[in-house]
C-alpha cells in the first residue's frame, strides 16, 4: 500500500469514529427539566428529553 493510500484509510477511520461518537446518547444534568434530579438526554442531533436515569 502506498503512503497516500494509508493516509486516505486513516482519514476514513477518523471520520467513521467521529460519526459513531455523534450518534451516541449525550446526557447532562439539565436546568430545563422540571425535576432537578432528572437528566436531559439527547441522541445525536435529536431533541432532548428529561429522564430519571440516563444510559451513557
From Swiss-Prot:
Molecular functions per Gene Ontology:
toxin activity
Q: Which tissues and organs express this gene's product?
A: Expressed by the venom duct.
Cellular compartment(s): Secreted
In the record, which residues are listed under signal peptide? 1-23
Q: What residue ranges are annotated as transmembrane?
A: none
Q: Which domain of life is it from?
A: Eukaryota
The reply to whether Amino-acid biosynthesis figures as a keyword in the UniProt entry is no
What name has this protein been given in UniProt?
Conotoxin Cal6.41a
Q: List the disulfide bonds.
A: 27-41, 33-50, 40-54
Function noted in UniProt: Probable neurotoxin.
Q: Which GO terms describe its cellular component?
A: extracellular region
Q: Which UniProt keywords apply?
A: Disulfide bond, Knottin, Neurotoxin, Secreted, Signal, Toxin
Its domain comment says: The cysteine framework is VI/VII (C-C-CC-C-C). The presence of a 'disulfide through disulfide knot' structurally defines this protein as a knottin.
Mainly resides where?
A: secreted
Q: Which organism is it from?
A: Californiconus californicus (California cone)
Amino acid at each position: 500500500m502506498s503512503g497516500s493510500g494509508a493516509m486516505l484509510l486513516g482519514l476514513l477511520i477518523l471520520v467513521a469514529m467521529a460519526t459513531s461518537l455523534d450518534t451516541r446518547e449525550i446526557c447532562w444534568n439539565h436546568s430545563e427539566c422540571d425535576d432537578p434530579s432528572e437528566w436531559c438526554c439527547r441522541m445525536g442531533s435529536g431533541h432532548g428529553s428529561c429522564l430519571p436515569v440516563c444510559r451513557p
